Structures are given as structure tokens and as C-alpha cells.
């Protein structure tokens, strides 16, 4: 029994050292902060040396500052111990930062699985596209047109020819011209280009290195991220409420979804 007790004590102290909570071992739970209690709970699991560590929304009850701190702590922990983590969350930031692979579910049905980059760059449907990315992807009513064997998206009086990679995928799928939902991420929109859409500013958020423009575009809400280093003059004057802003995006940044929300490249 003594050997077992010594082994348990050894594991407890190793886990405490890993989580930097050795100084709290003699404290009662009520004397610990929320973040400290979370680390103690994780330590209890580590002591058992599990092959798989399941975490079910462990940060959901923490405030924003503590949540960010604990997110970094869990990432460090993953780097220290050789254990598979299964992490359940509704927070896409946690999913993107923690996961080597992400499984996105809706109503108990798997929508898509892959690396964070794969899901961000190639969402299988509208649900995944809207879930991954902050701010979320913009969606517009548009038409997929096909002229001389080339695909383009048409909206607001302009046509944007899709990239060669997207062309090849649509050709391989035998996709026909049709009404679509066009998805474009806020960071893939630019205030320059040959063919420009126009919208009006509802809200301008100065974030320091970037400005987030919340706009009305063809009666749809849209967000554009503009890097302040690319701007000249007063941001406040240029992006006042009601001001018109012209913008464009490239064919490689277009995500085309059919009437059922499926990405036509899949």
C-alpha cells in the first residue's frame, strides 16, 4: 500500500508541476480562483494517465480574460504530455487554436472534418462557412454563370471570373449555371479593383491595426476588414455612417454554395 501511495503522490506532484499549481496543493477548493480550480480539475485527470483526455467546454463559465489565459495554458499542456485530447466546444476560436483536426456537427450530424486550415479555406457547406472565421464569412445572393467554358459569379452588375483551381473543380463536377449563395471572407475584400461593388457604412470599428466596416451591401449585412496601414487620411471621415464604399474581391476568394447550402466544389 505504501508503494501505491508513494506512486500516487509522485503523479500528483508531477501533474501539479506541469500545470504550475504546486503552491496550491495544500489549499481547499473554496480558497482557489476559477482558473486555479480549472487547472486542479485537469490535474486530477492527468494523474490517471489517460490515453484520451475528454474536455467538455471547460472554459465556458470563465470570463473573457481568464478564458484567454486558460486557452494558452491548455495549449502548453498539450505540448507537455503525450495524450490525445478530445475537446468539445461551441467556441470556434477554441476549436481553431486547440485542434489538429476539427469535427463540426449540427443536430448530431457531422458536417465536415479536417484541419483548421482546411475547414477555413474549403468549407463543405454554409453552416461550416459561417461557423469558422471571425468575423464570419459574408454571404450574398448571386448567379453562377458559364461563358465559353469559364465560370464566373455575377452580382450587383459585376462578374468575377473564378480562379483556375475552382474552374477545374466545377468542370470535374459538371456544375451548371445556377442561382447561388456567394461567400467571401471579410479579410479577402479590398478597396480597389477593376470591378467594384458598392455598399454603405453602418458601423466603423477601429481595432488598431485594422478597421472593421459593418456595411449594407445589396440589402445584406456585410463586414469588410481594412488594414489601417493601407489607408490614407482620416479613417473617421472616410468611413462615417452612411458613406458609400466601393470594394472588390478575387476569383480565388469566392465560395459558391447551391440552393441547399452545399459547396459546389465538393
Question: Language-model segments: what does each one mean?
Answer:
Residues 81, 135-136, 193:
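Residues at helix C-cap/C′ positions in short coil/turn segments immediately following an alpha-helix
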Residues 147-266:
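Non-catalytic connector elements of ABC transporters
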Residues 1-131:
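ABC ATPase nucleotide-binding domains
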Residues 122-147:
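C-terminal boundary and immediately downstream tail of ABC-type ATPase nucleotide-binding domains
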